[in-house]
Amino acid sequence: MGDILDYNTTALFICDPQKYYLDRVGGIDVIVRNIKCLIDSCKELEIKTFMTKHNPSIYDEIIEELEPSNHPVFEKTLYSMYTKDLKKNIDELYNSNVRDPTNYLRTVILAGFETHVCIIQTALDLIREGYTVHVITDATASIDSLEYTASLKRLKQSGVYLTTTEAVLFQLLRDDANPKSSKIIDLITNRSISLPSYYKEDEYGVQITHSKSN
């Protein structure tokens, strides 16, 4: 079953993009650029963004390039973004307009850290609540590459769509005639990513090589 994204009914969830991971995840600069591209593109498309930070006394604060300018950050200890506070915020933003087909939350784009812990538990919580979930494989990571790959398999088994930063943004645009098209394409192009240096390909397509030892 296919699912075409509509930016009127989509939100971006960025999970725990914290400084703890900067010297622990291989290819972290690529992942940060992709997350930044998602945040900036969703801002341009007027898609709501929600961000969490996990137990900052251990995992430090948000990576500087990703510090929020116009979206909330929810502090948590739960291994899922779908906390009571975040759910309450979603209910306040969307439920009063539930009868408006252009302003309800149907689909979540999910990126951040770590794939096998908070990403997978967030995705499963959202699916249980009836949302469609798209995990951005080149904008999420685990410190251990084996955990990352195994988690993608589990996500796919659970009905999560696995996609990439560029693919999901073009799906949101839908048409070159979209007045936002030029700006979004610029954001995609300006990531300045060197594919041979950071990516490998397997059954899920192009992915980051995460482990420092790879």
Curated annotation (Swiss-Prot):
InterPro entries xref list: Isochorismatase-like_dom, Isochorismatase-like_sf, Isochorismatase_domain
Family annotation (SUPFAM superfamilies): Isochorismatase-like hydrolases
Gene3D superfamilies documented for this protein: Isochorismatase-like
Domain of life: Eukaryota
Similarity comment text for this entry: Belongs to the isochorismatase family.
Name assigned to this protein: Isochorismatase family protein 2B
